[in-house]
């Protein structure tokens, strides 16, 4: 669909030549300090995911990371050209230079992503983000980098939201497999915060998932649901229905509309209104041929496009 609409598909894989730099920062009208504060929040979350372990980073460790972050952007703030944008490697070097055993542990955790086989995100961004429709494809990124990739893409979208806000343009953001961002506490807390920030800054975020159970079991789910006006439910299994009834307050009658329901039918929750719906997508259309994923219907999507 993105190709048919002349959008840009960015494939993020270990062997890809398309790069996203997690250190990219979007300067706002509020000045460097405000932008850096938001960026620091993201990078600390990234480090927490990599080096935090079961209990997460301690506050003193986060404080040292924050201090290092403030220094490595000095060159870029003095002359904000692309080649002066810091890399993950600059953070790694700054942490080592701090000569603190606790921080050295964090730096050692970053080695794999800076000098090791998973250093895909240690490059300057070379993706042209000028297209109005962009798709970041992380399907082949691998388990080691997938969660990091989702977090980094989310931050790249935030940079676009921030940029578009200056131009008074709304930004629509669709995140598939959204439950993965809520699986780990570190990424879940940040994702809820970015969800709220998107809405406040003119973004229109939409999370999609087939793993409703995992999604609703997250400790941070209330922060997502409380900041979402619209919920779209299709057919659900019995186990997930019980969770939906508890989290969304659905009655047995309402749940019947997502029990063994046909494709294109289910429930819409809008504010405090619950609406059953049937939406049969016409199969004789170009968009159906492009978006159809049923293997039994051998459709040549290239011909459709």
Where are these regions (language model features)?
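Bulky hydrophobic/aromatic packing residues
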Residues: 10, 195, 247-249
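C-terminal regions of RecA-like/P-loop NTPase motor modules
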Residues: 212-305
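Short hydrophobic alpha-helical runs that function as membrane-insertion/retention elements
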Residues: 9-12, 204-208, 231-234
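Long, positively charged, glycine-interspersed low-complexity recognition regions
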Residues: 199-207, 227, 246-247
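P-loop NTPase motor domains
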Residues: 1-7, 14-16, 20-203, 216-219, ...
């Amino acid at each position: 669909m993105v190709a048919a609409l002349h959008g840009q598909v960015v494939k993020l894989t270990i062997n890809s030549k398309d790069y996203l730099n997690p250190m990219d920062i979007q300067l706002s009208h509020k000045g460097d300090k405000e932008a850096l504060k938001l960026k620091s929040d993201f990078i600390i979350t990234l480090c927490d995911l990599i080096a935090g372990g079961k209990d997460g980073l301690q506050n003193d460790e986060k404080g040292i990371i924050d201090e290092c972050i403030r220094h490595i952007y000095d060159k870029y703030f003095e002359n904000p050209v692309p080649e002066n944008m810091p890399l993950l490697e600059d953070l790694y070097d700054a942490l080592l230079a701090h000569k603190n055993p606790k921080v050295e542990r964090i730096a050692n955790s970053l080695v794999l992503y800076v000098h090791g086989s998973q250093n895909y995100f240690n490059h300057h961004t070379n993706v042209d983000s000028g297209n109005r429709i962009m798709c970041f494809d992380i399907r082949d990124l691998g388990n080691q980098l997938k969660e990091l990739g989702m977090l980094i893409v989310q931050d790249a979208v935030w940079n676009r939201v921030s940029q578009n806000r200056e131009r008074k343009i709304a930004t629509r953001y669709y995140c598939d497999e959204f439950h993965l961002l809520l699986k780990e506490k570190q990424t879940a807390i940040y994702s809820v915060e970015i969800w709220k920030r998107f809405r406040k800054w003119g973004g229109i975020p939409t999370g999609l998932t087939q793993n409703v159970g995992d999604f609703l079991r997250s400790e941070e789910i209330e922060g997502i649901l409380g900041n979402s006006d619209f919920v779209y439910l299709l057919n659900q299994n019995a186990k997930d229905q019980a969770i939906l009834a508890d989290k969304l307050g659905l009655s047995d009658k309402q749940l019947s509309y997502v029990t063994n329901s046909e494709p294109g039918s289910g429930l819409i929750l809008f504010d405090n209104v619950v609406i059953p719906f049937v939406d049969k997508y016409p199969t004789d259309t170009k968009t159906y041929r492009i978006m159809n994923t049923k293997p039994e219907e051998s459709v040549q999507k290239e011909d459709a496009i």
